[in-house]
A protein has these predicted regions:
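Hydrophobic alpha-helical membrane-interfacial segments at the cytosolic entry of transmembrane helices
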Residues: 139-164, 176-181, 244-252
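Periplasmic/ER-lumenal interhelical loops and adjacent helix-loop junctions
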Residues: 154-231
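Hydrophobic/aromatic-rich transmembrane helices and adjacent perimembrane loops
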Residues: 218, 270-300
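Membrane-interface helix-loop-helix junctions at transmembrane boundaries of multi-pass membrane enzymes
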Residues: 138-147, 224-269
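Membrane-interface helix-loop junctions at the exits of transmembrane helices
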Residues: 55-72, 159-169, 186-197, 247-284
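Membrane-interface coil-to-helix junctions
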Residues: 1-34, 64, 73, 78, ...
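Membrane-embedded helix bundles of polyisoprenyl
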Residues: 29, 33-46, 51-93, 98-134, ...
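Hydrophobic alpha-helical transmembrane segments
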Residues: 2, 6, 18, 22-37, ...
């Protein structure tokens, strides 16, 4: 896939660049730097200020296995927009003025539209979660403000997709190959696919479920278990208060990621059907397993 963001940036220099010039390496480095920076900001927004803890958390998020797994598909390495959207969700609750955060959210939306359609769709969903939080949790916005925000956010994504030319591709050209196959396995958070862990073996999965790769890493798994124990013992709401809109949207995306055949390893736990109009629209995002990424970073 192309990376419209980089193509537009380098277009003015086309006449002076060599014929074999490519920006893949530049963009991968940029993604790594931005992902690390967004992770640092996110942890600060979560009141993690001790340098050692914040640095460790930044490294875990910045060097996430799910990001390295996408190196063969550079346009999909733009996970910094997802972590950036999480930062806005967490950080905006601490400030009196929402104006700077609104502009940041608009910027994240705009950038995501120029990276990859999958990431644009995920970022839009995270924006919807933020708008719900402002209305239903923080009570900082009235209902009409958030309800107006939904179409505005969607328009930013759709308008920029139209500018790029995504709507010039017919659905016939997209086909249905992979729909219901490139999915998320329930065990994906613990499945290293053999290549991403020295200690954790690959778990059973269906042949094409690599698109739902979501391995947390051994450190991430241990931290998740420790966090669950500590949260069970804790009585205060703390920083997790007000996360239900985020969990709801990330959970819905994870359900979509599993598609209509839900597997635990190689065992099919559940099979159901989508309505025809949903299946028709889902052809655009037929590698549904990728939609686990927002939940992945939320869990991590």
């Amino acid at each position: 896939d192309s990376i419209p963001l980089m193509a537009i940036l380098f277009k003015p220099f086309h006449s002076i660049l060599p014929e074999d010039f490519q920006y893949i390496g530049i963009y991968l480095l940029l993604c790594q730097l931005l992902q690390t920076w967004m992770a640092w900001l996110l942890l600060g927004a979560m009141s993690i200020h001790k340098p050692g803890a914040r640095l460790a958390g930044t490294l875990i998020l910045g060097l996430a296995p799910v990001w390295f797994f996408r190196w063969v598909h550079p346009a999909l390495c733009s996970h910094y927009v997802l972590i950036g959207a999480l930062w806005i969700y967490m950080g905006s609750r601490k400030t009196e003025s929402l104006s700077p955060w609104i502009w940041r959210q608009l910027l994240i939306l705009w950038i995501s539209a120029y990276t990859h359609p999958y990431l644009g769709g995920m970022t839009l969903a995270l924006t919807f979660a933020w708008l719900l939080r402002l209305w239903l949790v923080d009570k900082r916005w009235q209902a009409w403000q958030s309800l107006v925000g939904f179409p505005i956010a969607a328009s930013i994504i759709l308008l920029n997709w139209w500018v790029i030319g995504y709507f010039g591709v017919s659905s016939e050209g997209m086909g249905t190959v992979g729909l219901g196959e490139y999915t998320l396995n329930i065990l994906s958070f613990f499945d290293s696919l053999n290549s991403y862990s020295t200690f954790v073996p690959s778990l059973p999965h269906m042949p094409k479920q690599y698109e739902g790769f979501a391995y947390l890493g051994l450190g991430g798994i241990l931290l998740l278990l420790m966090t669950l124990v500590l949260r069970f013992r804790a009585k205060e709401k703390g920083v997790l208060h007000g996360l239900w809109p985020l969990w709801a949207f990330c959970g819905l995306m994870a359900v979509y990621a599993m598609s209509t055949d839900i597997y635990v390893g190689e065992f099919r736990l559940l099979k159901y059907s989508w309505a025809d109009f949903i299946e028709e629209k889902a052809q655009v995002f037929r590698a549904t397993g990728r939609f686990v990424w927002p939940l992945y970073y939320l869990v991590l």
